[in-house]
Amino acid sequence: MEKITLNPIARVEGTVNLPGSKSLSNRALLLAALAKGTTKVTNLLDSDDVRHMLNALKRLGVSYTLSDDKTVCEVQGLGRAFEWQNGLSLFLGNAGTAMRPLTAALCLANSGNESPAEIVLTGEPRMKERPIKHLVDALLQAGAEIEYLEQDGYPPLAIRNKGLHGGKVKIDGSVSSQFLTALLMAAPMSAADTEIEIIGDLVSKPYIDITLNMMKIFGVEVENRNYQRFTVKGCQQYQSPKTFLVEGDASSASYFLAAGAIKGCVKVTGVGKNSIQGDRLFADVLTAMGAKITWGEDFIRAEQGELSGVDMDMNHIPDAAMTIATAALFAKGETVIRNIYNWRVKETDRLAAMATELRKVGATVEEGEDFIRIQPLPLAEFKHAEIETYNDHRMAMCFALIALSDTPVTILDPKCTAKTFPTFFDEFSRISQ
């Protein structure tokens, strides 16, 4: 297996221009494909997950042109629901941001569509372990025709595009906000209004804000009543905004901001105080820990401070919260990250993976059902470990921070960062001294 060893880093300093946000990139591509008119999407993320979405859209008859560096995509919108030849199968890798929204969008029918066609959505083995039942249950209430091809509640799925009739739909919000995002994005093209009621506590609310914000940019307003009920008018058509700029990925910013907070000064550009991404709030956690944070319109800067552990609910920033788990090793006092059950249904079971790998470097860790408790280490007591990444891009990037100790760190399968940040280790090396 390929691996990379990072030697101890004395200091980090520099500016990192962030790649586009994965969450925004795949939402923008899907909305642009469904919208009337041509949309030029700029600062698109060039990564595995986005490639899976682009490949799927092409096979669904969407025309687009991609720049040589794959960061500008001009999408010819269909102005209608997707159509395909019966029996089409789409492979979506481990891209939840493609699997979930497409599951809902492919249920939609065009007027006059007399004979629904079947399509199969499948992916890597890990995708077949990632639950989708809450979304499918909600879509079935709205009139969808979906069947599980292997294990109940999990992909692969067979979908027939016989349409969604709207009406009252209940959806469980406790596992993933992507299920609600998928339902919201399909609802305007249903045959009638949809009233969505959330069961349980909605996780990752800031990701719903991204969805609602982007739907508005594409011409559709949603009535949001305190994240408990959403009303979406039916028989609508998305309208191209002509251009859409993808913000820098705030989750990807977290590794560099944490590095600056631990041992130097790092500025990230492409995301700032007006960002629509919830993970910008990661910087507030660093502030609470003692880092010096500066906010700009289009940048965030983190400078080294004396870091102290925190005990916080991080349900609102589940992806960026992983970075706090490794940064916690450099703080005084224990850190507890709470209300993160949905780590268990991500690219891997991130709670188990994080606890296992932190222990390898010498940390004392308690893994709860929905929390993790971490005791810090003196810099000289870190152990040189080989870090398993579990084909999870965020595990690889989080553990790069271990090199800010007095000990090297070896990361297995470093290329798994291609899911969201193919050049991560080059950028990390560039700011390291």
From Swiss-Prot:
EC number: 2.5.1.19
Active site: D319
Keywords of the record: Amino-acid biosynthesis, Aromatic amino acid biosynthesis, Cytoplasm, Transferase
Chemical reaction(s) catalysed: 3-phosphoshikimate + phosphoenolpyruvate = 5-O-(1-carboxyvinyl)-3-phosphoshikimate + phosphate
Gene3D superfamilies: Enolpyruvate transferase domain
Major site of localization recorded for this protein: cytoplasm
InterPro entries registered for this protein in UniProt: Enolpyruvate_Tfrase_dom, Enolpyruvate_Tfrase_sf, EPSP_synthase, EPSP_synthase_CS, RNA3'P_cycl/enolpyr_Trfase_a/b
Xref: Pfam families: EPSP_synthase
A GO CC term attached to the entry: cytoplasm
An example molecular function term from Gene Ontology annotations: 3-phosphoshikimate 1-carboxyvinyltransferase activity
Protein residues bound to phosphoenolpyruvate: K22, G96, R130, Q178, R350, R394, K419
Keyword Membrane: no
Protein name, per record: 3-phosphoshikimate 1-carboxyvinyltransferase
Organism: Actinobacillus succinogenes (strain ATCC 55618 / DSM 22257 / CCUG 43843 / 130Z)
Taxonomic lineage of the native organism: Bacteria, Pseudomonadati, Pseudomonadota, Gammaproteobacteria, Pasteurellales
